[in-house]
Amino acid sequence: MPKRDIKAFLYDILSYMDDIINFTKDMDYEEFINNKAIKYAVIRCLEVIGEAVKKIPKDIREKYPHIPFKELAGMRDKLIHQYFGVDYLTVWETAKYEIPEIKKEFEKIIKDLEEK
């Protein structure tokens, strides 16, 4: 399998962030918590984002210290390994309030890389 470059991982992150935003659009917490399919889809997207973030090289992570790379990766680990202890309120708040803001930062990384 050919090695993927950093931009491929960044585009994966953006794609899954778009999915999260679209899945939770026009939805409140009560609807989210009662919609098993959306809950599971958002969790899966966060897992993939967390895995892709781990592929971002250290020099890029250091160049953008305000982006919560470590937290995104850590959330992935918690979601993968705590099957019965998922904090759905944290998942919701991350999906609804943090992902749209963080997405802008990942878009900036791609823009910066493409301008090189």
Swiss-Prot record:
Query: Which residues are reported to carry the modification O-di-AMP-tyrosine?
Result: Y83
Give the residue interval(s) assigned to the motif RX(4)HXY motif. Answer: 76-83
- A Pfam family for this UniProt protein? HepT-like
GO cellular component entries: toxin-antitoxin complex
Tell me which UniProt keywords the record has, alphabetically.
Answer: Hydrolase, Nuclease, Nucleotide-binding, Phosphoprotein, Toxin-antitoxin system
Q: Which GO terms describe its molecular function?
A: nucleotide binding; RNA nuclease activity
Record PTM text = Modified by cognate antitoxin MJ0126; probably at least 2 successive AMPylation events occur on Tyr-83.
Please state what class of enzyme this protein is: hydrolase
Catalytic residue list: R76, H81
* EC number(s) recorded for this UniProt protein: 3.1.-.-
Q: Which family does it belong to?
A: Belongs to the HepT RNase toxin family.
Query: Which PANTHER family does the record associate with it?
Result: RNASE MJ1380-RELATED (PTHR34139:SF1), UPF0331 PROTEIN MJ0127 (PTHR34139)
Q: What does this protein do?
A: Probable toxic component of a putative type VII toxin-antitoxin (TA) system, probably an RNase. Probably neutralized by cognate antitoxin MJ0126. Neutralization may be due to AMPylation by MJ0126.
Q: How does it assemble?
A: Homodimer, probably forms a complex with cognate antitoxin MJ0126.
Q: What is this protein called?
A: Putative RNase MJ0125
